[in-house]
Structure formats: C-alpha cells, structure tokens
Amino acid sequence: MTARLQEFYKEQVVPALMKQFGYKSVMEVPRFTKITLNMGLGEAINDKKVIELAVGDLTKIAGQKPVVTKAKKAIAGFKIRQGYPIGAMVTLRGERMFEFLDRFVTVALPRVRDFRGVSGKSFDGRGNYNIGVKEQIIFPEIEYDKIDALRGLNISITTTAKNDEEAKALLNAFKFPFRN
C-alpha cells in the first residue's frame, strides 16, 4: 500500500509542476529523495543516558532506528574526544518518507507554539530545504509526561530540484505553510 502523499504526488503534483515549469518528461519533475532527521546532543558528553533517550525519541518520531553519530575528531574546547557519541540521525526514504512528511505538515507543524509558517529562506541553493524544530513534543508520538528534557532536531528535505524556485513549488504543492 502506497502512502497518501505518494499517490497525491503522482496524480496531482506531477501534472501541475510539468505545466508550471514546462517540463517535457515526467522524470524532469522534482521529487523528494530523502528526509534526514538529525539531533545534535552536546550534553551527551557528561551523561550517557541522553543518547539512549534521544534515540528512543527519534525512533518514535521516524518509525525506524536512528544511527548514533560519533565525533570525527577531538576538540579540547568542547571536551570531546574522537569517537564520542554526540548525536543521532535517521534517514527516511520511500514510503516512510512520505508518511513522515504527511504527519509533519498536517499534525506536527500546527502544534508548534506561536506558529506563523516556516521560513521560505531556508533553501540551500540546490533545491534542498532545512527546518529546525525547537521541541520534539510537537510530534504526537512523543508523550509529554515521559520526556526528560526538550530537545530540538534538524529536518533536512532533499529533493531532485535544480534550484530553490523548483523546490519551493514542490513543497507548496504539498501544502507546506510558508510565511514569506
């Protein structure tokens, strides 16, 4: 069974973007490649339990087990040695990616405190979009009573779009709430 947004993309988004940008082939139309969720955990240096709790949160949010990221090199100023666990990340592709995107746009984003829309300036120049989430409790999978601390995460949406304009049109087609 395909995800709801995956069918929406094939049936409505592709024809609309082909008309808007004058693409000749369906393969030219921008599409999502992957969504990466990354949680940087600087406080994990002092407390090893933080990593386990963050991995648990990311597992609930993404629906798959994240990878613990380790420091590439030692930084004395931050008291980090090479190989220390300093974060967790998970990459979503295919059906899980579309299901996450659906939950994120329809459920999680409206739950953000004082939400006025996401920034339209967070594109990287190559058609990819990044969003910083300050609190993991905006996701319905996280139970408010069972969290130990509020942790933010970075959500990186990678597309096949050639430029920011095409990527923004793709995200707009999926009802992304841009404020500017």
Curated annotation (Swiss-Prot):
GO BP term, example: translation
One GO MF term attached to the UniProt entry: tRNA binding
GO cellular component terms given for this protein: ribonucleoprotein complex; ribosome
Keyword annotations: Ribonucleoprotein, Ribosomal protein, RNA-binding, rRNA-binding, tRNA-binding
InterPro entries per the UniProt record, alphabetical: Ribosomal_uL5, Ribosomal_uL5_bac-type, Ribosomal_uL5_C, Ribosomal_uL5_CS, Ribosomal_uL5_dom_sf, Ribosomal_uL5_N
NCBIfam families: PRK00010.1
HAMAP family for the chain: Ribosomal_uL5_B
Subunit organization: Part of the 50S ribosomal subunit; part of the 5S rRNA/L5/L18/L25 subcomplex. Contacts the 5S rRNA and the P site tRNA. Forms a bridge to the 30S subunit in the 70S ribosome.
Role: This is one of the proteins that bind and probably mediate the attachment of the 5S RNA into the large ribosomal subunit, where it forms part of the central protuberance. In the 70S ribosome it contacts protein S13 of the 30S subunit (bridge B1b), connecting the 2 subunits; this bridge is implicated in subunit movement. Contacts the P site tRNA; the 5S rRNA and some of its associated proteins might help stabilize positioning of ribosome-bound tRNAs.
Family the UniProt entry places it in: Belongs to the universal ribosomal protein uL5 family.
Protein name, per record: Large ribosomal subunit protein uL5
Species this protein is from: Cupriavidus metallidurans (strain ATCC 43123 / DSM 2839 / NBRC 102507 / CH34) (Ralstonia metallidurans)
Gene: rplE
